[in-house]
Amino acid sequence: MSKNDHLSDDELSLFREAVQGSKKLQQDTIIHQPSKNFSDLQQQRKSLKEGKNEEFFFSDEFVPLLSEDGPIRYARDDVSKYEVKRLRRGVYVPDVFLDMHGMKQDEAKRELGSMIAYCLKENISCASVMHGIGKHILKQKVPLWLAQHPDVMAFHQAPLEFGGAGAILVLLSIPDR
């Protein structure tokens, strides 16, 4: 029956007589969820992508070529050595500090990825990673992980005021938005 069809008075009274005494059923099995907004779906996809990118870049098998003489340092090919010198001197002041003391390698890798993702999201260009000295496990791994990330421009052992031999200052490239 379409909406344009009209019931006659006899048909309407016959229907009311037939359903007289019946109770309205309570619908309790199907839950109607509101349709999702397209922007909500885009936001969910973006957050999933960011979550995947937090740990994606760090491999334990890949070993980049880092200088073994002197304090730990690294600069991409397109980065001036002057930037590394500025990191060493403490010209760049870190806005974010990541303390890895007591973390296991997997946890440290995940936190490092989260810190880099946070810095990129908040447009923070300099961060400090405090790996500590301890058994030298994280002290050896953190530079290898940082050198693999495409947004890390350079890093250098931190000056004494930012942690000295137990920390690394990281310079990140912030994409133009």
From Swiss-Prot:
Top enzyme class, one word, equals hydrolase
Q: Name one GO molecular function term.
A: RNA endonuclease activity
**Alphabetical keyword list:** Endonuclease, Hydrolase, Nuclease, RNA-binding, rRNA-binding
Q: Mind telling me which Pfam families this protein's record contains?
A: Smr
Residue ranges of every copy of the Smr domain listed in the record: 98-173
Oligomeric form and interacting partners: Associates with collided ribosomes, but not with correctly translating polysomes.
One BP annotation, GO: rescue of stalled ribosome
Q: Which organism is it from?
A: Aliivibrio fischeri (strain ATCC 700601 / ES114) (Vibrio fischeri)
PROSITE patterns from the xrefs?
A: SMR
What name has this protein been given in UniProt?
Ribosome rescue factor SmrB
User: What function does this protein fulfil?
Assistant: Acts as a ribosome collision sensor. Detects stalled/collided disomes (pairs of ribosomes where the leading ribosome is stalled and a second ribosome has collided with it) and endonucleolytically cleaves mRNA at the 5' boundary of the stalled ribosome. Stalled/collided disomes form a new interface (primarily via the 30S subunits) that binds SmrB. Cleaved mRNA becomes available for tmRNA ligation, leading to ribosomal subunit dissociation and rescue of stalled ribosomes.
| Listed InterPro entries | Smr_dom, Smr_dom_sf, SmrB-like
Family per UniProt? Belongs to the SmrB family.
Among SUPFAM superfamilies, the record links this protein to: SMR domain-like
The EC code for this enzyme is 3.1.-.-
